[in-house]
A protein has these predicted regions:
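Short beta-strand edge/turn micro-motifs at domain boundaries
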Residues: 95, 111-145
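Hydrophobic/aromatic beta-strand elements that line small-molecule binding cavities or substrate pockets
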Residues: 80-86, 100-102, 117-124, 137
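Short helix-adjacent coil turns
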Residues: 14, 20-22
Length: 145
């Protein structure tokens, strides 16, 4: 598969995992060395504000975390638009710029959690395909960015 098509597929697979509440499918996206640092809000450009949501990838721990999230929240809408895909000259690294507009609602109706903005998803080519190395959150950039 062409690398650009492969990156598009993994972005779409991640979205499909959210929409179907499929923790196992979501786990297929992650690189074994991913660590998930995350901004607490969409304008936290300064990493001094960020939190560490998940330590180094551990399949069982991450699966339990995702399954709990999927059990507690339902997706109201999920629109993701790929704006740019860049493949390294060596063909073994890539990133995708994705505009995200996702709204989650607690299944008990008590709260909503919007995830809106632009993400840069960073990938490495592994023997079993492309895997996400990092995504530093979904940020809202100034107009015209």
């Amino acid at each position: 598969m062409d690398p650009t098509d492969a990156i598009r597929e993994i972005v779409e697979r991640e979205s499909r995992a959210y929409e179907t509440y499929d923790a196992d499918l979501m786990l297929t996206v992650f690189h074994p060395d991913i660590v998930w640092a995350w901004p607490p809000h969409s304008r936290a450009y300064d990493p001094m504000e960020w939190v560490l949501r998940m330590g180094r990838f551990n399949r069982e721990r991450w699966r339990a975390y995702l399954q709990k999230f999927f059990d507690d929240y339902e997706i109201v809408h999920n629109t993701r638009t790929i704006r740019k895909i860049v493949i390294s000259a060596e063909g073994d690294g890539a990133f995708a710029v994705v505009d995200i507009d996702t709204l989650w609602r607690r299944r008990d109706g008590s709260a909503e959690m919007p995830n809106t903005g632009r993400a840069c998803k960073i990938y490495a080519l592994m023997p079993d395909g492309w895997k996400m190395m990092h995504q530093p959150g979904t940020m809202t950039y100034p107009a015209g960015a």
